[in-house]
From Swiss-Prot:
GO molecular function terms attached to this record: 2'-deoxyadenosine deaminase activity; adenosine deaminase activity; zinc ion binding
GO biological process: adenosine catabolic process; hypoxanthine salvage; inosine biosynthetic process; nucleotide metabolic process; purine ribonucleoside monophosphate biosynthetic process
Residues the record lists as binding substrate: H22, D24, G181
Family to which this protein belongs: Belongs to the metallo-dependent hydrolases superfamily. Adenosine and AMP deaminases family. Adenosine deaminase subfamily.
The gene coding this protein: add2
Described purpose of this protein according to its UniProt entry: Catalyzes the hydrolytic deamination of adenosine and 2-deoxyadenosine.
Organism: Streptomyces coelicolor (strain ATCC BAA-471 / A3(2) / M145)
Catalyzed reactions: adenosine + H2O + H(+) = inosine + NH4(+); 2'-deoxyadenosine + H2O + H(+) = 2'-deoxyinosine + NH4(+)
The protein's name: Adenosine deaminase 2
Binding site for Zn(2+): H20, H22, H208, D298
SUPFAM superfamilies linked: Metallo-dependent hydrolases
GO CC annotations, alphabetized: cytosol
Keywords of this entry: Hydrolase, Metal-binding, Nucleotide metabolism, Zinc
Active site, per annotation: E211 (proton donor)
Length: 359
């Protein structure tokens, strides 16, 4: 591990990239309160600070199913154009304020149709809000490129419909696809037709795997479904019996040697019980073993976090250096679902010069 360290204030200004971040898990607490009032939805509290604390405490159950259940209140205020436009616009502005220069936001449009919008209308509305946010961020001198990953919910039957929308909107801001939701009992291969369709249409996709479920979910996501990245993937360590020795099993070696990005989310993993502490989170050992690990927030409201906070935690509790942070930032951009020239420009023109200035 390199020796150069960094203070938090400098860290806030460094360019960042986030690949795994859910739109409905990242609303501002004040926005949830205001939108809930406008649609008549009852919240646990109407005080924004208390609501933020409620989310964080409710998510700290150590159980993925309970963690997911906290989304009911954010989803309740994202069922019309007003809520979707505001959530999307503020999403971009919040990333820009956090120093993020590239982000991929994911959401499942089927979860936003209770107010009468079609899935297509949901996608159109979110893209409109994201475009507004990017224009405002650029005008403020903090440009950020945000691409969309459409999600299918693995426990429901509209995954193929979401995949069709990813194909339809791939030239209109949608850069890829994912399936989300409870892993146990809902293997990704249940939706193989959707993944085969995406592959035929040359649309990249990631799959949530290796979080609540173990190696079989990672193997199936990669070798059966053909995922280009893995969402979370912390359980890949089950195929590395001795992390210190670094002897890899066949699946772990495949992931490392083929440079398959792991979208790791330390704070979220602590909340769902997928990891025990920041200091012992597998991201550090996997980074040191040469895996293409990336650092992510997952759900900024639910986890009470930002990219700056995630980086700070790794610096303070896992001994990370600025070189380590640069590595995972470059890793994320190398594995982003946008064209090669865009990724290269962000790495060479934005990220590397900024990190060089503090080394």
């Amino acid at each position: 591990m390199s020796s150069t360290r960094i203070d938090t204030e400098t860290l806030r200004r460094l360019p960042k990239a986030v690949l795994h971040d859910h739109l409905d898990g990242g609303l501002r607490p004040a926005t949830v309160v205001e939108l809930a009032r406008s649609v008549g939805h009852t919240l646990p509290t109407t005080d924004p600070d208390e609501l933020a604390a409620w989310y964080y405490e409710a998510a700290n159950s150590g159980d993925l199913v309970r963690y997911i259940a906290t989304f009911e209140h954010t989803l309740a205020v994202m069922q019309n154009r007003e809520g979707l436009l505001r959530a999307a616009e503020e999403y971009v502005l919040d990333l820009a304020a956090d120093g993020v220069v590239y982000g991929e936001v994911r959401y499942a449009p089927e979860l936003n149709t209770r107010g009468g919008l079609s899935m297509r209308e949901v996608v159109e509305t979110v893209q409109e809000g994201l475009a507004t946010g990017m224009a405002k961020a650029a005008a403020a001198g903090t440009p950020v490129r945000v691409g969309t990953l459409l999600c299918g919910m693995r426990m429901f039957d509209r995954v193929r419909e979401a995949a069709d929308l990813a194909v339809a909107f791939r030239d209109a801001g949608v850069v890829g696809f994912d399936i989300a939701g409870a892993e146990d009992g809902f293997p990704p291969a249940d939706h193989l037709d959707a993944f085969e369709h995406l592959r035929r249409e040359n649309v990249p996709f990631t799959i949530h795997a290796g979080e609540a479920h173990g190696l079989p979910s990672i193997h199936q996501a990669l070798q059966v479904c053909g995922a280009q990245r893995i969402g979370h993937g912390v359980r890949i360590t089950d195929d590395i019996p001795d992390l210190a020795a670094g002897k890899l099993g066949r699946l772990a070696a495949w992931v490392r040697d083929r440079r398959i990005a792991l979208e790791m989310c330390p704070t979220s993993n602590l909340q769902t019980g997928a990891a025990t502490s920041i200091a012992e989170h597998p991201i550090t050992a996997l980074k040191d073993l040469g895996f293409r690990v990336t650092l992510n927030t997952d759900n900024r409201l639910v986890s009470g976090t930002t990219m700056t906070r995630e980086m700070s935690l790794l610096v303070e509790q896992a001994g990370w250096s600025v070189e380590d942070l640069r590595t995972v930032t470059v890793n994320a951009l190398k594995s982003a679902f946008v064209p090669f020239d865009e990724r290269t420009a962000l790495i060479e023109d934005v990220v590397l010069p900024a990190y060089a200035s503090v080394l």
